[in-house]
């Protein structure tokens, strides 16, 4: 009886008693808090504390990051949270471990430090250096063959190539292969195979 009273006064349930003394039912939707590793890299800071369902839903759960969903209650920094806790436990633990790193770095780098936990390229980050970034990826304009996009590429030949802004390397005329122009009215009516470079025999048409 003394042991049961002592266990009831504990603020949390020991991990050893989750499955042994109080085994949950097999098909249960109850959420049990599982403690993760204590010393993990910063990139795994958001996965340390999570409510994991036991039973048929234990395979994999959709866990919102708080960046792309509208419901802020499902964000990672709000889980897990005790019903009587006035603060976010997971964020407080993370901030206590990495707060001294943020104070010693510029503001732009602290945002990069926070982005390492949940990479979301939809939200562009602000950095002190002038190079263009999108999310946490450095944006570089590299000419990729065949991947360029021009708004009025179908109007090639209207203006000179050296003055046209829609000139695409390897794809604009005269580099564009035969019978690949967008204007199909300029194609020949005779069938042609570009792979074998074969043309059909000419059809005899009597002239009057």
UniProtKB/Swiss-Prot annotation:
Predominant localisation class: cytoplasm
Signal peptide location: none
Tissues/organs with expression: Expressed in trachea multiciliated cells.
Coiled coil, from the record: none
GO BP terms: flagellated sperm motility
Gene Ontology CC: one annotated term: axonemal microtubule
Annotated PANTHER family: HYPOTHETICAL PROTEIN LOC690617 (PTHR31254), TEKTIN BUNDLE-INTERACTING PROTEIN 1 (PTHR31254:SF1)
Name of this protein: Tektin bundle-interacting protein 1
Gene label: TEKTIP1
